[in-house]
Amino acid sequence: MKRLSALLLAFACIASLQADPLASRNRASIDDSGTYRGNFALNQAAGDAQQQSNVRVVAVGSAALVGSDQRQHLQLDASQPIAASASISGAALRGSGILGVNQGAGLGNQQINAFRLSLSNGPESLDDSVLAQSVALTKVSGSATPVPGGRSVSTDDRAFAGSSGVVQVNQSAGVGNQSMNTLSVRVME
């Protein structure tokens, strides 16, 4: 009788997984993993049409100048309900240096982490083109209609604990989310 119960339970679990084969496709998870030193970039995507970017630009010299231009565009046709989850759990991603994490689950999430550092010994001017580097465009490129489904994002208190340096994290679950972290540092002698 115990074998029959165990067998029926196993078939029930398999049947529930087969009932929604897409459910696991929209789940991104980082658990108790990853230590780093120096520059570390991580893009994790679950689902469809995710756009993620981690950019690091460093310039050193008498007239050092840094810049980066990133554009993401996406047209979504989301008509099916989507359940999505993104989680960072346990003592994940602890270290020192520059860390960029993009974690997206669902459909059509756009994420950017940008870090720019310039070291120079000459004066520099700050004009509109430099200021525009840190602007996230507000043009909506996601789904025009709401898409039903449950979404969840979680980050454990132990994640990133003890990290030093620059930590940039974008974490989203759902449809058409846009997030951006940008940091520009200029050091002049």
Curated annotation (Swiss-Prot):
One of its GO terms (biological process) is amyloid fibril formation. The keyword Repeat applies. Disruption phenotype: Deletion of the entire fapA-fapF six-gene locus shows no visible growth phenotype. It is found in: Fimbrium; Secreted. Residues 1-19 form the signal peptide. FapB_R repeats lie at residues 26-61, 85-120, 156-186. Keywords: Amyloid, Cell adhesion, Fimbrium, Repeat, Secreted, Signal. Its main location: other. It comes from the Bacteria. A minor component of the functional amyloid in this bacterium. Probably nucleates fibril formation. Upon overexpression of the endogenous six-gene locus (fapA-fapF), cells form large clumps during liquid growth, make large amounts of biofilm and produce amyloid fibrils. A minor component of purified amyloid fibrils. Fibrils are resistant to boiling in 2% (weight/vol) SDS and require >90% (vol/vol) formic acid to dissolve. Belongs to the FapB/FapC family. This is Functional amyloid subunit FapB. The lineage of its organism: Bacteria, Pseudomonadati, Pseudomonadota, Gammaproteobacteria, Pseudomonadales. The gene is fapB.
